[in-house]
């Protein structure tokens, strides 16, 4: 009897582990409809799939369902904040804020997880192969051939990527809108990390974005009131959380 109880106890302990294994919807460039992977207990069970071997991992994004709901609410709050700020301004200032809001409205965000998805790194990095519990979505984009410029600039959008070209030169053809930071821009790389790039004549550094990066020109701290505190950081957060195209 003790043996039977012991076996039953082990079974009851094992059941939640099997139940908690991740379910992942995988979007690949060759199909509009996602494929579903079930019973993925660790990250390597997902990214180590042979069918994904040729994926462009620097731009891959994995998101968790509950975190996605949070990210969507945060992005919605950001858009509402920009709307409110624009209503408090007029003229060129209001137009600049509305331009940024319109650019951000086109973004779709998700609950991006801060994890390296390159299978080689997952295999060898300490704590690089975390467990998967719950519902996830993985996006695997085609390697882009463009860089996106956005923010308080005259002509936001995609620009052809040119090897060796630095952040400042991508902005040379732009006019800055009212209240823009004319000394620094932010680079949001496809893997989600960011870098502050000096772009003025007095502090310029040669920083090259990679294909798929976003160059963001934000609000100048000295120009705006304290109502704008943290706004650039909130915008960068949404850009990091964007769903790849």
Predicted feature residues:
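N-terminal signal peptide c-region/cleavage motif recognized by signal peptidases
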Residues: 15-17
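A general, composition-driven signal for non-globular sequence regions
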Residues: 10-13, 190
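Sec-dependent signal peptide recognition
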Residues: 2-10
């Amino acid at each position: 009897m003790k043996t039977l109880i012991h076996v039953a106890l082990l079974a009851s302990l094992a059941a939640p582990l099997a139940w908690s294994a991740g379910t992942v919807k995988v979007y690949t460039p060759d199909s509009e409809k996602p494929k579903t992977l079930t019973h993925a207990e660790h990250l390597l069970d997902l990214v180590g799939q042979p069918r994904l071997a040729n994926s462009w991992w620097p731009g891959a994004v994995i998101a968790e369902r509950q975190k996605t709901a949070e990210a969507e609410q945060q992005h919605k709050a950001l858009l509402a904040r920009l709307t409110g700020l624009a209503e408090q301004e007029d003229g060129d200032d209001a137009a600049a804020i509305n331009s940024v809001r319109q650019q951000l409205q086109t973004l779709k965000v998700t609950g991006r997880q801060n994890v390296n998805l390159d299978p080689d790194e997952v295999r060898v990095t300490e704590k690089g192969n975390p467990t998967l519990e719950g519902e996830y979505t993985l996006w695997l984009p085609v390697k882009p051939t463009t860089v996106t410029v956005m923010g308080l600039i005259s002509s936001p959008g995609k620009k052809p990527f040119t090897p060796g070209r630095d952040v400042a030169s991508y902005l040379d053809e732009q006019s800055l809108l009212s209240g823009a930071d004319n000394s620094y821009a932010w680079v949001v790389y496809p893997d989600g990390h960011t870098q502050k790039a000096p772009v003025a004549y007095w502090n310029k550094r040669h920083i090259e974005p990679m294909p798929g990066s976003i160059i963001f020109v934000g609000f100048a701290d000295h120009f705006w009131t304290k109502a704008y505190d943290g706004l650039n950081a909130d915008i960068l957060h949404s850009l990091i959380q964007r769903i790849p195209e």
